[in-house]
Design a protein with these regions (language model features):
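The two-metal-ion catalytic cores of nucleic-acid processing enzymes
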Residues: 1-330
Length: 330
């Protein structure tokens, strides 16, 4: 599907066909970075994927070259070095000289097989009263820091065939910072209406804006399973960079997940076909997309006296919702 070459003018932030049939080059404004687990040589390895958008509105994912998670230990005794080198989760170690607390000190760099093992090793070492450095950085951020990347990057590599993905994927051979630019984002906003008696879905309405221009609007109704299937299909079709709505973190997304489970379905909203994932702080993670709850942003930026959708719409847009009695919705 993506056998053409892609190249860009420096700083243009877009892509175009080139003469090479395999190599591609693109400049992206990054949306987010996500850790994916892949089986490489029979072992689960974490690989960072960068998601972004070009200046001319093409969303893409970048599979980076695998790199091991790592941290540093300040002046570990020889007995601890031996234990680390023999540990099943430790991939490799090497000595380093680092500037710590105003002086140069002997340290040990510890590379592990999986980032999920770093907290366990970190806590074990700290329990032995050792100083551990760089062990609190999420793995996908670690990749960005280690490669000195900013908000925009230029990537060169080959297009990868990824079944179930809603955007093209580049396998990065080289990755470098690029001149800053603003990319037009595709934003999907949705709202769910449901029964107050048994929580059944009545309908789901959505709109899609691309670069600020309305390009699609749709109302999904009928049976619950059909509404959920049509919604996930709409996400895959329109491939939004941002999913938004009013209180979707606290209501709409949890409700959709609840009703999907009731029907033996999964809420597949990620660009890689993965499920939406609710975090412990009530926010949601969708791979390759930004979930931006309008309620949280209004609360943080505007701090309105009243936080209801009706009050905020009136304050910002000069419009109010249709006056529907919730008790009569069923």
């Amino acid at each position: 599907l993506w056998s053409l070459s892609v190249s860009v003018t420096r700083g243009a932030g877009g892509y175009k066909a080139g003469p090479d049939s395999e190599r591609v080059r693109a400049t992206l404004r990054l949306l987010n970075a996500v850790s994916h687990t892949e089986v490489i040589d029979g072992r689960n390895i974490t690989v960072v994927y960068l998601y972004g958008r070009t200046a001319d509105g093409q969303s893409m994912a970048v599979r980076t070259e695998p790199q091991p998670p790592w941290f540093q230990v300040v002046e570990p005794p020889d007995t601890m070095v031996a234990q680390l080198e023999a540990h099943a989760e430790v991939r490799a170690t090497r000595p380093e000289r680092l500037w710590v607390d105003g002086t140069e000190r002997d340290c040990l760099r510890v590379e592990v097989w999986h980032p999920g093992k770093v907290p366990q090793l970190r806590d074990w070492l700290r329990a032995s009263e050792l100083v551990v450095l760089a062990a609190d950085i999420p793995f996908h951020f670690r990749y960005i820091y280690d490669h000195d990347l900013g908000g925009c990057v230029t990537v060169e590599g080959e297009m990868l065939e990824k079944r179930g993905w809603s955007c093209p994927v580049i396998g990065a051979a080289t990755l470098a910072p690029a001149e800053t630019f603003t990319a037009p984002l595709r934003v999907l906003s949705f709202d769910v209406e449901n029964s107050l008696l048994d929580r059944r879905l009545f309908c789901l309405c959505l709109t899609v804006h691309d670069g600020g221009e309305l390009v699609a609007e749709q109302m999904l109704d009928g049976g619950e399973a059909g509404i959920i299937a049509s919604f996930t299909a709409a996400i895959a079709k329109h491939d939004p960079d941002v999913i938004t709505g009013y209180n979707i973190d606290g209501y709409d997304l949890p409700l959709l997940e609840e009703r999907a489970k009731l029907h033996g379905m999964k809420l597949m909203l990620g660009r890689d076909g993965s499920e939406a994932d609710q975090r412990s702080n009530r926010t949601w993670a969708v791979r390759g997309r930004v979930v931006a709850d309008a309620w949280w942003n209004v609360k943080r930026e505007i701090r309105p006296r009243q936080e209801s959708l009706n009050a905020v719409a009136k304050q910002l847009l000069g419009r109010e919702k249709h006056d529907v009695n919730p008790q009569q919705m069923d």
